[in-house]
Regions:
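Pyridoxal 5′-phosphate
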Residues: 1-200
Length: 200
């Protein structure tokens, strides 16, 4: 990946999403001309008031998260070995299966790329008449991990028109199976059925 190809001075990315690293890790790609905003506590040359000239020391202050770095390295190795396109195809397949199944459920609104071209392994949805946190809790009781709310992305929710309600988000990965997606859809159907009975 070349920054020049992206016409960007910096590219930042989380390590715990598609790279399968631990939470709290990430990557910051920057050109050689990048300079620190503040100086002090260099980590590798603590007696100096200024950061070292050589990269990466110039941009690395303090104590490094070595366990996180080691975990991220293993995630990168896994992705490299498994193949980015192979992982992406599987995630899209599972996401498409979840999208099609959710779209058949009454009162469920799915937020997805209608063309399917830009859809990634992340899918958000809402349930009419149910708070998204309530749906998330019901799924958690059934051993299904989702994220409910604004997902640290209020601007995306403003664009989607879900800033007030939030959404429920699923993120199928290379470690999930079609059977697990089918289980998720069955449990969603049951949650909706139970909610309908309560509201009658």
């Amino acid at each position: 990946m070349l920054l020049a190809d992206w016409r960007a001075a910096f590219v930042a990315m989380p390590g715990h999403k598609g790279l399968y690293g631990p939470q709290g890790t990430g990557l910051l790609l920057c050109g050689a001309e990048a300079s620190p905003l503040l100086y002090g506590g260099t980590g590798s040359a603590s007696r100096r008031q200024t950061m070292p000239i050589d990269l990466p020391d110039r941009l690395e202050a303090g104590t490094h998260n070595m366990p996180g770095i080691a975990g991220l390295l293993e995630g990168l190795r896994f992705v490299s070995h498994a193949g980015v396109e192979r992982i992406a195809q599987w995630e899209r397949r599972l996401t498409r299966r979840a999208e099609e199944g959710l779209a058949r459920l009454p009162g469920v609104e799915v937020f997805a790329d209608k063309t399917g071209q830009g859809q990634t392994g992340v899918l958000s949805f809402c349930v009419k008449g149910m708070d998204c946190e309530q749906v998330g809790e019901e799924l958690a009781r059934r051993q299904i991990a989702v994220r409910a709310g604004l997902h640290c992305a209020p601007l995306a929710h403003r664009t989607a028109g879900t800033l007030e309600s939030g959404t429920i988000r699923i993120s199928p990965s290379v470690f999930n199976t079609e059977g697990q997606i089918n289980f998720f859809l069955r449990e969603m159907r049951e949650i909706l059925r139970e909610n309908t009975k309560k509201s009658v």
